[in-house]
C-alpha cells in the first residue's frame, strides 16, 4: 500500500535566506510524532537548528499532538535531534562559524521507506534590498508568464 506523500516546506527560508548547501537528515521522533507527520500536521515556521555537544538539533518545530494518542502523547514544540554523518556535521559546524551563516530547515518529507527526513540548508541571511529584489523578480516572471499565455 502506497502512503500519501508528505511535503512540508518552510517558505520563509527561501525568502529570508540565501541557501548555500543542503543536507538531508533523519529525525529522532516518538510514535505519535511520526503519525502526526504522516497526516501532514507539522509546521516549520520559526524553526532553526543549533549545535549542542557536537550534535545538531532542531528547535521550535511544531508537530501537532496526535488525535488518537492517549496519555503518552508528545509535546508539540520540543527540541528534536537530527541524524547526520560525522563529516556532514563537521561541514555544517565549520560553515556556521562564518559570520552571517546559520542552518535552517527547508523541507520535511517522508521517504520511500516511510522515514521522516528533514532537509536543512546552510544559509546566509538576506538584506532588505535583496528581499525587495527577489520580490521584483517574481513579479516580473509572473508578468512574463501572463503575456505568453495570451
Swiss-Prot record:
Its main location: cytoplasm. PROSITE patterns: SSRP. Keywords: Cytoplasm, RNA-binding. One of its GO terms (molecular function) is RNA binding. GO terms for cellular component: cytosol. It is found in: Cytoplasm. This is SsrA-binding protein. Transmembrane segments: none annotated. The keyword Cytoplasm applies. It comes from Bacteroides thetaiotaomicron (strain ATCC 29148 / DSM 2079 / JCM 5827 / CCUG 10774 / NCTC 10582 / VPI-5482 / E50). PANTHER family: SSRA-BINDING PROTEIN, TMRNA-BINDING COMPONENT OF TRANS-TRANSLATION TAGGING COMPLEX. Belongs to the SmpB family. Required for rescue of stalled ribosomes mediated by trans-translation. Binds to transfer-messenger RNA (tmRNA), required for stable association of tmRNA with ribosomes. tmRNA and SmpB together mimic tRNA shape, replacing the anticodon stem-loop with SmpB. tmRNA is encoded by the ssrA gene; the 2 termini fold to resemble tRNA(Ala) and it encodes a 'tag peptide', a short internal open reading frame. During trans-translation Ala-aminoacylated tmRNA acts like a tRNA, entering the A-site of stalled ribosomes, displacing the stalled mRNA. GO terms for biological process: trans-translation. The gene is smpB.
